[in-house]
């Protein structure tokens, strides 16, 4: 965490249902860290994730890979068998922290020494102050949480929580212990780590919190604080038209994160041939910002009042995400709607599922060409009545999407909301309750005299995040020269990330303990694919 956040939040213990102010302050600090992280722009019965795969013959501690299955393909992987727990048990966490408050519905009376431990692998994301450990009392159960990696081999360390942007296949903790699950928190862009967009990468995890509605703890609406955020009054048409007459273009583009997987600048460049667009950021800049302080477009994520007032003058905002993936929607979409501008959107293909009504955004991909889109925008720009139909969701009763309304109502976490936990604390409590349920199920299975199947591990699926290969913002990949920076960077990164997931899976399946051998496994993966082709 930043020094500023440390000074702001200097004490107290987080719990479910109390200390709401502290929780919200922590949320603000954590969001600062998350924003800064984006680039400019397992015998006893133990449930595990990938762990020891079924390719091994036998269930003893000394396993020999099957000769037929040394090179494991993605579609041949199966959940692991049960393996003994780690023998390491010397660490005593009983004195690390005192008990904190009880959460509603939590009757857990175990001492700290008896609780399962959750380890935050990304230290900067640890959502507690002060120190490096805390007891959390969640809706159903309690856990110890820590960022101290010295406990990673502890028999009570039941889950490791990773932050997606920081997760590196070549730095993953090996060997993967059979008694531990892995949890993934990733609310940021797919471009930050394409390993997670492939099945070999995402299935390494047992619990997920991502922007996808299909994840275990969805963060899809992270940029929408409340439904009321959408109902903020728009500038009058008279004022918007006045700014148009004063020389403002109908469309605003403000972006300083260039050369991204969505290749948005390539499309904007073509659109500019047919439509007047004011571009103030470093990408496609064609106009100087009247306020020098606001030239840094990082102010966009802080909702700086002057920035918001300035951008509200524009009738249309080009709202183009830096990567294309289902349910990945950011402030680029929600901010124009808050201000009363019409988003011209490209990003999540499923975005309409989340809109306040069925007539509130313009989808770039609904038009055959940039020229066709430009003609439509110019028509709306000159027709106030038709333009205002896109803002009817701001009227009383205008937000009619019951899916959006119910999703917001059921959301367990909040944004700047003192009555709800932030999503970091919410997810760790989700993992805590799941791990306590898993431990209980394993104990029941071991005590059972009737045999039967052991508890199945919960494993993430492709749709918990899986995102498609990047495609050009305009035209086809075949038309783009091989020397093009977008083609060299993002297509290569996407497919190398697939190989990294395959390599790490193979290392885990073979009980590899040496992280330095990762690139040997990468080479093996490459050779295997070459032979298959």
Swiss-Prot record:
Membrane topology qualifier: Single-pass type II membrane protein
Residue spans, topological domain Cytoplasmic: 1-20
Top EC category: transferase
GO cellular component terms listed in the entry, alphabetical order: endoplasmic reticulum; endoplasmic reticulum membrane; Golgi membrane
EC number: 2.4.1.221
Pathway per the UniProt entry: Protein modification; protein glycosylation
Keyword Transmembrane helix found: yes
This protein's UniProt keywords: Disulfide bond, Endoplasmic reticulum, Glycoprotein, Glycosyltransferase, Membrane, Signal-anchor, Transferase, Transmembrane, Transmembrane helix
Protein name per UniProt: GDP-fucose protein O-fucosyltransferase 4
